[in-house]
């Protein structure tokens, strides 16, 4: 997801349990919360429109970003425009449950596989526990183009906490809030001098490599009649990301 957004693709985040495939513990371990504003009744179509627009955040239900904005702009409601590199103000209201289940999926048990599998709900990395972790603090991070640029520890006490961050923006970027691995907002794009987001050539090259791997394994399942058209589509995608790599910052 980060790699695609670094290439300027506005892919919106959503989440759900996919019970029992992604999580066999219970329905509702993965959730999406949509900003609907003040409504008299919930309209499912409008809720879906909110997901499509990115007016949402994903969570496990024990961590929440009740408000999140960049220079007053919330995810899915528009972009922040800057004429040159400068500073933006990120504000959020976050809340964390006073008691959180103990487990790898909630980030409070380190699996033998290390940090890269923290939050995984597919595999059982440690014995199941019915115990809860009470209190403590949760690290809230501001992410710009995939990198954490600021953070603050917030009490897990069930109360709402307002946090504010001044963030420097050097080029067109996406900005989001996360608490790993329980919470992530959709981003707000900050566009500098009307330039597209081209945050990382490495991200574009990663996408090229993924396309090659996909073709290697998927092409065998494509009929011979349809394979030339499929190959052309893969080639167009690869060429697009190669062009983005040329336009991007190298790192």
What are these regions (language model features)?
Residues 2-12, 17-251:
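C-terminal functional module detector
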